[in-house]
Amino acid sequence: MAFSPWQILSPVQWAKWTWSAVRGSGAGEDEAGGPEGDPEEEEDSQAETKSLSFSSDSEGNFETPEAETPIRSPLKESCDSSPGLAEPEAKPQESREADEQLVAEVIEKCSPDTCSRSSENEAPQATVDSHPVKDVRGKAEHDVSKISVVRPFSIETRNCTDDPAALGTAAAHGCVPVLPGMALPSTTPEATQDEPVMDRGMGVTLEAFTEASLKTGGPCPEPVASRSKLRKPKPVSLRKKMAPEPEMLMEGSPLPKASSPWLPDGLDQNANPSVLRGSGAQRSPLNLKETAGVLSNDTSDSGVEVAPGSPPLQLEDDFTEDGENVKIRSALPKQSGRKPSNKLAPSIRKDGVSKPVGVEQPSDPTVQDALLDQMSPKLDPSKRSHPPANFFGSGPILQNSPPLSSKCSHHFDPNNINTDDSGDPCKPTPALTSSGFCPATGNHVNEILDSPKKAKSRLITSGCKVKKYEAQPLDLDACSQDEGAVISKISEIPNRDGHATDEEKLASTSSCAQKSAGAGVKGIEKETCQKMEKEELAVHGLLESSSEKAPVSVACGGESPLDGICLSEADKTAVLTLIREEIITKEIEANEWKKKYEETREEVLEMRKIVAEYEKTIAQMIEDEQRTSMSSQKSFQQLTMEKEQALADLNSVERSLSDLFRRYENLKGVLEGFKKNEEALKKCAQDYLARVKQEEQRYQALKVHAEEKLDRANEEIAQVRSKAKAESAALHAGLRKEQMKVESLERALQQKNQEIEELTKICDELIAKLGKTD
């Protein structure tokens, strides 16, 4: 298996690469954010640092530093797509102060001869209320970090006809016309305090104001020198530092204003117009209802025709949150000396409800007068209680105004750009005559921001590319569309709240590269839409400039302030040429992004192969480890069983040994008894031996005595036998003698018997003879 740099990295390098991928380019912006450290920022950074410890399941295996990573981080790519964000961020304090003085000089030159009527109405108020500005500041600087995007309500007030274009430009961009000899007591301290953070945010506003003044013929040549310094737009997450100024100026500063009443002075000077959208949506609904009467009154006095079916006061959706909570937050005082957090994600409160796109304007003149009265700066309650006192002098000025032409509006749906190429993305829609350029984008961003939070991720929401010709507010309106597109892209990056595998990291970076390439294609179509919008608005500007007695041009909240600027043919041609050049540039940039995407895609595929091999190796290692663990578990179980058996045997042996010991003790006692018996038996044996010896002695004595007696008996027997033989011989001789006698008698008997028989026979014969004779 081939090794790659991914497999031989240290944990420190991996942590650095993961940190850079999560933070993007936000690290440098945090360092330039201000000299003071915010506790909330420190907590957020600590939370992000902690979340990095759970960023991957293979942190200890391989690391990839920023320089060796073949895939760019998602946030950096989205940020690099707008070259205006890639410029240096730090700016010396002297250049900031010079910019502030330059803006003040430009305003003084543009307004000393053109603001006489408004100065007469409002100069006493400025002198009276300029002192309490510092007193009100403590309670006015409440936490309005939630208000990150404000859109100016385009009502330009022209107090005279000397230089209406320059004054209209200043009014459109929110610049404050100042009387000769009058300083800016409210904007300068606030700008000085928040300048380290607001510098890039206010660059677009100042540049737009100065260039529009130059093009319209105003005597303002000085701002050209500082344009390179001012072209440093800052992401929305860091623009929120300039939010404490609007409320302070609205509550405590009664300076004369030619800007929109819904856009305070501090916000007009410091906020980027590319994100100043939907400020009316951030006010309470009561203000809209009250101000409707003032506006309708002024319109009826001056003869302005208002179409009852087309609401001209439609406002864009808030990009961060719904406006229902803004009024409550504005009433809460902010702790002094503390800046709002520059993190976008932690400071946004999500509500599932978005503001309505438009607010219908009533046709009643009294209602319109009340509307203009409510849109004026917040003054003391005694002055606000008199509706006829219009601080803009709208009653006498609007009397000769010509009827308003139907306002051009375009329905721009970024979700349907690439689906239908044949359709015109900038087709005018009569149903949305007064809506903003990107209401769908606002709703889309609201849906993104209303989604549940996960880990804290740094979202860079400023995707607009600020050029020299983008002083026109129409281009800045299109920037808000780019903002929504960038938010929708960046929000799809997976949040790193837990363990993220290496494949997820690669997939997230590749998807971001694809979306950044698609953003270039969308930018071309957006430029085409902007071109058509500029042409139509230029026609409206010519129609309004044709009337010499039209000091006021009322534009709806969804349209650009370009209607109040009188453009010449040369200016329009130059603008169109610049737009065409920008379209070509965007096409080239899109092609470059496509090439970068293909290269990155090849690298991602290669890395996926490497990761697949790595996963196979890891799987094999895990398999071997599992087998080893199984065998070790089996052997361990066997050893455990053997151990248990040995323990059982040991217990039985111990029991046997204890029994043997007891038996041994018993046998020991028995043996002692045997020894005692042996001794007794030995004694008995000795006694028996002694007795046997005694008996032997007695036997010997008896034997000798018996032998003597036997000898005597034998002698007596011999004597008896000799005597018996002599007696038997005598008896035999007497027997023979007797036998001879018997034999002699028997023979004598036999002779007698024979003689008897012979005599008997002689007698029988004689008797027989005698009986015969008888």
Curated annotation (Swiss-Prot):
InterPro entries tied to this protein: TACC, TACC_C
Region feature Interaction with LSM7 and SNRPG, mapped onto this chain: 2-56
Q: Which GO terms describe its molecular function?
A: nuclear estrogen receptor binding; nuclear glucocorticoid receptor binding; nuclear retinoic acid receptor binding; nuclear retinoid X receptor binding; nuclear thyroid hormone receptor binding; peroxisome proliferator activated receptor binding; protein domain specific binding; transcription coactivator activity
Composition bias, Basic residues: 228-241
Which Pfam families would you find in this protein's record? TACC_C (PF05010)
Instruction: Name the residue ranges of motif: Bipartite nuclear localization signal.
Output: 452-468
Coiled-coil features, chain-numbered ranges:
579-774
- Gene Ontology CC: one annotated term: midbody
Q: Which residues form the SPAZ domain?
A: 216-294, 354-504
Q: Which domain of life is it from?
A: Eukaryota
Interaction with YEATS4 as annotated region, ranges: 207-424
Q: Where is this region: Interaction with CH-TOG?
A: 670-774
Stretches for region Interaction with TDRD7: 153-255
> Which stretches does UniProt call biased (Acidic residues)?
28-46
Where is the PTM Phosphoserine found along the chain? 4, 10, 45, 148, 154, 228, 376, 401, 480, 560
Sequence ranges of Basic and acidic residues compositional bias:
88-99, 131-142
Polar residues bias located where?
48-61, 113-128, 397-407
Q: Which UniProt keywords apply?
A: Acetylation, Activator, Cell cycle, Cell division, Coiled coil, Cytoplasm, Cytoskeleton, Nucleus, Phosphoprotein, Repeat
Describe the function of this protein.
Answer: Involved in transcription regulation induced by nuclear receptors, including in T3 thyroid hormone and all-trans retinoic acid pathways. Might promote the nuclear localization of the receptors. Likely involved in the processes that promote cell division prior to the formation of differentiated tissues.
The entry's family comment says: Belongs to the TACC family.
PANTHER family per record: TRANSFORMING ACIDIC COILED-COIL CONTAINING PROTEIN 1/2 (PTHR13924), TRANSFORMING ACIDIC COILED-COIL-CONTAINING PROTEIN 1 (PTHR13924:SF12)
Instruction: Name it.
Output: Transforming acidic coiled-coil-containing protein 1
Which gene specifies this protein's sequence? Tacc1
